[in-house]
Structures are given as C-alpha cells and as structure tokens.
Curated annotation (Swiss-Prot):
Protein name as catalogued: Protein HEXIM1
A Pfam family annotated for this UniProt entry: HEXIM
Organism annotation: Xenopus laevis
Known partners and oligomeric status: Homooligomer and heterooligomer. Core component of the 7SK RNP complex.
Family, as annotated: Belongs to the HEXIM family.
Entry annotated with the keyword DNA repair: no
Record GO biological process: negative regulation of transcription by RNA polymerase II
Functional description taken from the UniProt entry: Transcriptional regulator which functions as a general RNA polymerase II transcription inhibitor. Core component of the 7SK RNP complex: in cooperation with 7SK snRNA sequesters P-TEFb in a large inactive 7SK snRNP complex preventing RNA polymerase II phosphorylation and subsequent transcriptional elongation. Plays a role in the regulation of DNA virus-mediated innate immune response by assembling into the HDP-RNP complex, a complex that serves as a platform for IRF3 phosphorylation and subsequent innate immune response activation through the cGAS-STING pathway.
Coiled coil ranges: 213-284
Alphabetical UniProt keywords: Coiled coil, Cytoplasm, Nucleus, Repressor, Transcription, Transcription regulation
Gene: hexim1
Residue stretches of biased makeup (Acidic residues): 168-180
Amino acid sequence: MSEVGICKSLAGGGSLLAPKEGGGWHHPVEREEHPVGDANTVSEGHDKESAYQNPGQLVKAEAQEDDWKELGKKRHRRLRSKNKRRWKPYDKLTWEEKKELEERQSQRASRIRAEMIAKGQPVAPYNTTQFLMEDHDQEEPDLCPPPRKSSAALPLALNNSSYKGDSTDDDLEEEEDEAGSDGMGGYDGEDFLQKDFSETYERYHAESLQDMSKQDLIKEYLELEKCLSRMEEENNHLRVQSLASAPAADHRDTRIQELQVELEKLKEENQRLLQEGKQVAADSP
C-alpha cells in the first residue's frame, strides 16, 4: 500500500490559500505540542497563547492579582460591637430598678394599646395587679388593740344580780375575743406587735443600707447629722421655754388653791344659813 502524506500546514490548522494583505486573513498561530503529563508546561503554553491572542487580559489579570495580594496583607478592621443590653434577673433588681422597669412596661403597653385603637383593632383589657395593691393599701391596720378590762371590775359585775340575769355565753365569748383571739392579752399583744414592727423596720432599713453605695451612705450620714443638730436645738429651745413658764404655772396653781379654799368657806356658810332658816321656820307658829 502506498503511504498517504499529510500537509504540515493543514496539520497545524493553516489554510492552503495564501494570506492576503488588508484582508481578514491572519497568519496561522504556531502551537507548541507539550506532553500530557506536564501540567506546568501546559499552563505556561496557555498563558503564552492567551497573551498572544489578547495581551490586555493578561495585564488586567496581573493587576487584579496584585490588588488581591495587597488586600490580603492589610489588617481586617472589625466593626466595634454594639453595647449589649445588660440583663439582670428580676429578683436581683433593686426597688428603684423594679419601679423603672414597671413604668417602662406600662408606658410600652399604653403605647401599643393606643396604636391598636388608632388602627381599629380590638384591644384586650390591660393586665395589671394595681387594683390589688389599691385594695390592700386602702387603710392601715390598727396596731393598737382596745385596752383590756380590769380584773377588779369583774367580781363586782358578777355579784350584781342584773348582770347574773342578763349574762349569757355569747357575752362571755365576746369578752374572750376582746381579750385576744390568739390567747394573748391586750398589753401582751400590743408588745408583740410593737416588737414585730421594730424587727421588720430594722431588717428593711439594713437591706436598704446594703443596697446603697458609698457616696449615698456618706450623704445619708450627713443628713442625719443635720437632723440631729436641728432636733437638739429644738429641744434646748423647748427646755428654755419650760423653765421660763415655770413661775407662771406656780402662780396659777396657788391661785387655784386659793379659789378652792374660798369655795369651801362659801359651802360652809351656805350650810349654816340653811340650818338657821330651818330653825326659824320651826320656831314660828
């Protein structure tokens, strides 16, 4: 068999026609053949081919690569984190913080209710426990129970016949209730309530002092000193007034005693005149 020859220009992708000047034909691109296994050689060949075909793309790629390298060297600036909302459990809040929180919640609820009413949406009643506090604080409890009846008057009442006839078991129960439903007498119950009030007040005062800062404690101490000095001045002023009014009080007491003596004399004179009038009436026919 005869061997078939292949034209080198056709094998390289060329054309059999000669290129014309000023036409749309260009010189064939010379391509270099590289082994398949060498990846670096293949990439270099592609770079050369792309540079030969479009040199502007290579320049642009190199400039972009330089920009990325420069950007990678720069330090990444992080945005400053916003102040996080400091949350504290409700049981650890102070009295002032609890009051501010409740005021904010009530204002927010009122604002939302106003917006919903303006939009014509139905609004549920505002959930609050203020009515419970109002019912609780309507009047302060009476910490002074009524005085207990004296034990000396009880035997006299028992000896009275009218008391024996009218007394019933209900009256005795009422007397026991007046003496104290908890088994304590009037004075004992009053002492207990006074002691309990003092302990509660001292505990609350100690807790309030613990919650105060150093500056607040100093301020409170200075205020107490001012109050103490003012009370001492007032006490001294009252003492001077009492000493000044003592002679007038003594004079008033002596005048009262003199009037009492004159009253006794007038009573005796009246009795004497009554007796004389009776005798004159008896002697007359």
